[in-house]
Amino acid sequence: MINQTYRLVSARQFEVTYKDKVVHSDKVVVRPTHLSICAADQRYYTGSRGKEAMDKKLPMALIHEGIGKVMFDPTGTFKVGTRVVMVPNTPVEEHEVIAENYLRSSRFRSSGYDGFMQDYMFMAPDRLVELPDSINPHVAAFTELITIAVHALSRFERMAHKKRDTFGVWGDGNLGFIMTLLLKKKYPDSKVFIFGKTPYKLDHFSFVDAAYQINDIPEDVRLDHAFECVGGRGSESAIEQIIAHVHPEACVALLGVSEYPVEIETRMVLEKGITLIGSSRSGREDFARTVDFLAQYPEVVDYLETLVGGRFPVRSIEEITNAFEADLTSSWGKTVIEWEI
């Protein structure tokens, strides 16, 4: 069958390519229905990844956050019409210690390999997770982003000490919102504080115990553990503040991605015995846990609907470009594409 793939060929320029795909007996054919634009997609779209990365990875179909509908499954795993979340990480090996998202051999969609902007996806059944009909598809579109927080929390729980009375989350964006929401649900008797720089964004965090602007943090605020969800150049000052406000032997989870080297005051990390936990992306187990979590706690989905920003039905390359341009000017939430092309 002929499959159309919508690839970014240079900054702000998409083209359609046609591939003759053979339906193999071990692949499920999925029609994408709802996709969500990520900051990483925008770095490619705007060309801000730099010439070397752009030359190496383009042309490439963008987007690694999305859901779809099963159109054909020769493996018998899913019924036709089943809604599924698509897992972008594609491991080519298993390791007894290293998780699939940290294996250097793993392939990740929309990062050197074609993402979900295609007419059909041909995926192994273990790269799909069934999605209950009860979950809002516009929220489910950015399940991958939620799995990043779920994965980071699972790593934290394995490594952190048991005193978990106070948590701090730095970053008032999408990931910070999700992280604080998960912490409040996971530790209902603990206090969760959000630290950000934008007042109107902080207003969305109605469920936290306290919200602080980063230039006005009380001196006596102390935390058992913290999560950094800032990224970029701002992650350096965020980590500096975290080190100052956590108790000795705290665990600090680092989730923010920076294109630049970040300085860390290692003297105080050593003096306080702080554990830094790096966390990146996620694997199939995280997707399964996330879908189960959303199905179990529908009130969490209600909160996550706050993150749904622009909704763009897309039927042409021009409308793809319009969605990406609108996302660049959006100050809050996730842009969701209703993939009808």
From Swiss-Prot:
Pathway in which this enzyme or protein is active: Cell wall biogenesis; poly(ribitol phosphate) teichoic acid biosynthesis
Enzyme Commission number, as recorded: 1.1.1.405
Cofactor: Zn(2+)
Protein name, UniProt field: Ribulose-5-phosphate reductase
Record field: catalytic activity: D-ribitol 5-phosphate + NADP(+) = D-ribulose 5-phosphate + NADPH + H(+)
Sorted UniProt keywords: Cell wall biogenesis/degradation, Metal-binding, NADP, Oxidoreductase, Teichoic acid biosynthesis, Zinc
Signal peptide segment: none
MF GO annotations: ribitol-5-phosphate 2-dehydrogenase [(NAD(P)+] activity; zinc ion binding
Any Gene Ontology biological process: cell wall organization
